[in-house]
């Protein structure tokens, strides 16, 4: 009878990040959405996981997938996966990567670190390599990245299979960290150049030691709390915002919006918004012609933002109710991703 993994409270996880360096390894948290078209550069998908698109032609995507009952991941109480799609790929001059950044380049340094995950595909395929990179951060004069290759030419079949790898990471004695506090250990799969593939993966496990420890899921609430340390999205699309205090010149309204994240940003903060607002007058929605967004107090627990919208001077002095324009969701993202 196969062993069935259980959901453990965090204090049973023996102990902290040495026991499991990966956050959201069973792909349960998807704050940014569940379907992604990947573009050149870094693309965050399921929380904490990112796909680095190095360029070239073709269609690349990522999407939430589900584990079928009876498949191997389900025996460990894993129900979700991610599927990475590469179609018609050509012209790549560098390798695409998919994985996660573990905060602190000291993780497992000078020790054996083991990595495990489920992999399967729609046909027999070959993954280029599994890599760990010790990245010493930015700012100042940090030491150059060191690279450890765990495996090359990883054979993947249509059956979900758990793969296990172990390597000894270099010591970081004598190395120099950057001054921005963003040093980390990056663990990622690296795709072969110009390789079309449809790859499923879940159950990521990274731990210090010479063997991959059994995958143990945290509760969804605990996993979300860990994800919120790095990224938080608040959707204001469906919310009516109270009429704000206004200041204007001949053609602009300024309105304050206060957003309180659930955590104190540890490294940096970047707010992004798609601020297509509309106002209501005489029972009808009226759109503003232009908007912009800025923010202040970014290092404080409460982040105060201000958006500016142009308006018809004839409406000045009315009471406004703010709402997202139809079909245009408004997000506020607070990120301290490495």
What are these model-predicted stretches?
Residues 4-338:
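Extracellular and organelle-lumenal recognition/adhesion modules and their flexible linkers in secreted
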């Amino acid at each position: 009878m196969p062993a069935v993994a259980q959901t453990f409270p965090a204090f049973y996880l023996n102990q902290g990040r040495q026991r499991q360096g990966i956050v959201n390894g069973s792909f349960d948290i998807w704050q940014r959405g569940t379907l992604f078209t990947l573009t050149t550069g870094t693309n965050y998908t399921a929380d904490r996981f990112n796909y680095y698109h190095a360029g070239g032609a073709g269609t690349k995507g990522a999407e939430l997938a589900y584990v079928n009952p009876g498949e191997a991941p389900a025996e460990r109480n894993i129900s979700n996966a991610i599927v990475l799609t590469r179609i018609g790929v050509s012209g790549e001059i560098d390798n695409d990567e998919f994985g996660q950044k573990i905060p602190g380049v000291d993780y497992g340094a000078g020790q054996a670190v083991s990595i495990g995950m489920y992999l399967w595909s729609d046909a027999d395929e070959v993954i280029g390599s599994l890599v760990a990179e010790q990245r010493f951060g930015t700012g100042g004069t940090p030491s150059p990245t060191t690279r450890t290759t765990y495996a090359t030419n990883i054979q993947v079949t249509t059956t979900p299979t758990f793969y296990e790898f172990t390597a000894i990471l270099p010591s970081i004695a004598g190395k120099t960290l950057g001054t921005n506090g963003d040093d980390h250990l990056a663990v990622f799969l690296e795709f072969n150049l110009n390789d079309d593939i449809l790859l499923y993966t879940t159950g990521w496990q990274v731990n210090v030691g010479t063997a991959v420890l059994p995958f143990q899921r945290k509760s969804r609430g605990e996993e979300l709390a860990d994800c919120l340390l790095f990224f938080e999205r608040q959707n204001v699309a469906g919310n009516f915002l109270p009429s704000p205090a206004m200041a204007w010149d001949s053609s602009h309204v300024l309105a304050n919006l206060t957003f309180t994240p659930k955590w104190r940003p540890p490294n940096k903060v970047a707010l992004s918004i798609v601020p297509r607002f509309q106002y209501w007058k005489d029972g009808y929605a009226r759109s503003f012609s232009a908007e912009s967004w800025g923010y202040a107090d970014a290092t404080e627990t409460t982040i105060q933002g201000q958006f500016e919208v142009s308006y018809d001077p004839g409406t000045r002095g009315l009471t406004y109710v703010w709402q997202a324009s139809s079909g245009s969701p408004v997000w506020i993202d607070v990120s301290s991703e490495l």
